[in-house]
């Protein structure tokens, strides 16, 4: 999808991360990333050469996918319950998961962090690891696009004690980042 494409674009030539595996639904599994995405590539930059020939794995084959990676960026199109379950399955393979999905945003032991604002929220990971029975695996989520944009500004304004803040968003109707 669009978020996966954005991940691929942002991770191209990244100094810390290398995309070694892509996973999607059974419908795309077995195809190359280029075949699976095809004309649906919507980024302004071309599809990175490094991912074009990667064979898409089935996201539901958790053990197999997790054995090929050290870290998972998650942006899947499933029900919230399915997302929660599969992200925790990945975490239980001792694979850290950073999720773009909203499913875990209200899970008490899953941190939702804007690092410059609330890095202390990472502390809840230890409680999550106990619940999941993991030593390395966990799930962390990012806030929605509006909150992550406003949080730094609102935090800076706190010292001025505003009594009213009006925020307007112009989000994509689809919620898929299409503007």
Indicate residue ranges for each PLM-predicted region.
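N-terminal Rossmann-like NAD(P) cofactor-binding subdomain of oxidoreductases
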Residues: 1-179
């Amino acid at each position: 999808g669009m978020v996966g494409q954005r991940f691929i674009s942002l991770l191209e030539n990244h100094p810390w991360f290398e995309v070694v595996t892509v996973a999607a639904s059974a419908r795309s599994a077995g195809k190359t990333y280029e075949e699976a995405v095809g004309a649906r590539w919507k980024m302004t930059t071309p599809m990175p050469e490094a991912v074009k020939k990667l064979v898409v794995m089935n996201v539901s084959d958790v053990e197999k996918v997790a054995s090929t990676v050290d870290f998972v960026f998650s942006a899947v199109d499933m029900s919230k319950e399915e997302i929660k379950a599969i992200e925790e399955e990945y975490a239980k393979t001792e694979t850290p998961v950073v999720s773009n999905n909203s499913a875990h945003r209200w899970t008490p032991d899953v941190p939702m962090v804007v690092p410059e604002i609330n890095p202390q929220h990472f502390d809840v990971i230890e409680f999550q690891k106990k619940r999941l029975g993991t030593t390395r695996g966990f799930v962390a989520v990012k806030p929605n696009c509006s909150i992550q944009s406003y949080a730094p500004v609102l935090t800076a304004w706190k010292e001025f004690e505003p009594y009213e803040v009006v925020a307007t968003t112009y989000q994509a109707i689809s919620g898929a980042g299409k503007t």
